[in-house]
Amino acid sequence: MKFGSYRRPSALLSTLLAFATLVTVCSTDECFAASARRKVVIDQDAFGPAGSNLQAILMLLQSPDVEVLGITIPSGDGWRDEEVSHTLRLLEIAQRTEVPVHPGAVLPLLNTQSRTKVWERLYGKLFYKGAWTEVWPAEGAVRRTPYHADPYLVPPSPAGEPRIKPAHESAASFLSRKVREFPGQVTIVAAGPLTNLAMASRLDPEFASLARELVFMGGSFNPVAADNGFAAEYANAPRREFNMRWDPEAASIVLHEPWKKITEVPIDPTTRTFFKPEFIQEVARGQAPFAAYLGRFGQSFPMWDELAVAVWLDPSIVTRSTALLVDVDTSFTAGYGDTLSWSIGEGPGLGERPVTVVFDVDVPKFERMSLDLLKAPTPAH
């Protein structure tokens, strides 16, 4: 166009120019959440009913700016198939049956119950062994079905049996497919053992590099027991945490993968959180379709997995974090499964990745955020 023939742009052209400007601005990380709902795959050992595992899933389902692409399930707190059943029933109650559930690893990569018993004879009893826990303390333990060694047995649930079915595609395949479908956009929020992620990494060497980031709950550094009776076991084993101890080899594999960003929420900040009885009563009075479910099955425990979810949803709740190199001890010694860490630049140089480790959070802000999400009506999706 000649300069002399310049005219005011049409309304359509103005709209197109405005849209182009919006796209340019919102292509940055700062505007990513404003331009589209954040995509997430939840990897969770979803034992239930209710409890920290499933309440963490509910928080993500209740977040209006989050698109839950699917849920992948490994064994951990319970056996995979029982956890899958709890998750499917939760989705029915929450009226979110469009979210697919993909069964993952039944067993750790290398660790076994028999190996764990040998380890205990050598080095002492483990406080908690998830699906391998045969005898529970009389007080202070989560309400759950009796111990069973059959990983494929699904006992009846007091919350009812699901009518919907899990997806046929494996967890590892689904994880790989989603990061390739949305390269650089999918966050993996993992709140159980990392077996599924390790399998995805071995199935697809580009899996981690194609994800947006990894946020995981697990590991332990030097937690301080609170006055609620939890975390006392860390006085003697401050670096031993269940998610890493269930499958140390998987955790080590995942922590060496080329993620763009890794955020770890260890046990340390969770000891100051607690899902109080009054919280259960408050969410039971809420408008969510699962209000009665949480009112009936909710239990008062530290908010382990909810905190990992909240850190991703709103990083402003973090008041202290440190960048460290992190790994997990895979030697079959007294430290098997323990968290290893070094300051940046001081690691052994075997491919350790920098991890942002969260040590302190604004607990009242976190609690209010969690309750608001769990009380709200189901968002449009």
Walk through the language-model features, giving the residues of each.
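A short, structured active-site edge motif that brings together acidic residues
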Residues: 100-108
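Short, mixed-charge aromatic SLiMs
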Residues: 78-86, 109-110, 220-224, 327-345
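Bacterial Sec-dependent signal peptides at the C-terminal "C-region" and cleavage site
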Residues: 24-36
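Conformational coupling and interaction surfaces
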Residues: 36-38, 55-68, 235-236, 242-381
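Active-site histidine-anchored catalytic micro-motif
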Residues: 34-98, 112-114, 134, 138, ...
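Bacterial N-terminal signal peptides
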Residues: 11-27
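N-terminal secretory signal peptides that target proteins for export/translocation
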Residues: 1-8
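A charged helix-plus-loop insertion that forms the helical arch/lid used to bind
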Residues: 118-137
